[in-house]
Regions:
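Short, electropositive alpha-helical surface patch
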Residues: 212-218
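Surface loops and adjacent helix of pleckstrin homology
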Residues: 161
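A helicase ATPase "motif cassette" and its flanking acidic/Ser/Thr-rich regulatory loops
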Residues: 158
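Amphipathic alpha-helical segments that form well-ordered structural scaffolds
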Residues: 82, 184-192
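N-terminal accessory segment detector
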Residues: 1-154, 164, 169-181, 197-212, ...
Length: 223
């Protein structure tokens, strides 16, 4: 059983939830903490204590982060990154990555739906495009630089020319985590209006995380 007193310890990285989208009293970290504890139950005797220790020592990582990064971004990202770093030291990179990938994808998809108001607004192509632009202005992707390339009734394309999430992970020697965040986008966008709107990036390796200068985001109405 998960101790409810520690359910606030771990959140997915990076969190993409606008606070005004989240229901009062809803702590989305309650999604990822039980997942981590469950996944780690055979890797260590006391996974709950491991997470508490990470919570109490996360200041060590925060002091290492370049102050050029926004304080809000640091506050959001530091603990999940610190959990991952400690898992790598304890379990090795491969196991740590797979554990964090499940937590990030599960929590991230739930958070995406809150951020984009999926339960509050009708699911239409127009609303999806509007939400993407709005999230980039006021949501937790507001630190990225977005340019609209094309928008019509059947196609929407943007490019991200700067991703601070990737810059942060690279600065800490953890670039492998950025593609996991991209996987949240893949799952979320393609499940918003399945079989009606398809999301792609114009082909493989079209991301800043792949060494490109920009990330391509393309939505097309197909049904």
């Amino acid at each position: 059983m998960v101790n409810p007193n520690i359910s606030h310890l771990v959140d997915s990285f990076p969190s993409k939830v606008a606070s005004d989208r989240v229901s009062p009293g809803m702590d989305l970290r309650k999604i990822t903490t039980p997942i981590l504890i469950h996944l780690l139950r055979h890797d260590m005797r006391f996974p709950t204590l491991f997470l508490i220790r990470c919570k109490l020592t996360v200041g060590r990582l925060k002091r290492r982060i370049d102050p050029r990064f926004p304080r809000e971004l640091i506050d959001i990202a530091a603990l999940p990154l610190w959990v991952y770093i400690n898992l790598k030291n304890k379990l090795g990179q491969r196991r740590a990555f797979e554990v964090m990938r499940i937590a990030i994808l599960t929590g991230g998809l739930a958070q995406w739906n809150f951020q984009y108001g999926a339960a509050e607004k009708e699911r239409t192509f127009k609303n999806l495009c509007d939400a993407e632009i709005a999230v980039n202005k006021t949501g937790f992707t507001k630190w990225n630089t977005l340019e609209v390339v094309d928008r019509s009734e059947h196609r929407f394309e943007i490019r991200i020319t700067r991703c601070l999430y990737h810059e942060l992970t690279v600065s800490l020697g953890l670039p492998e985590l950025t593609p996991v965040i991209c996987q949240v986008d893949n799952a979320a966008f393609n499940s918003y209006l399945p079989d009606k709107v398809v999301f792609n990036r114009g082909g493989p390796n079209h991301r800043i995380a792949d060494g490109k200068k920009e990330c391509n985001f393309i939505w097309e109405v197909v049904g």
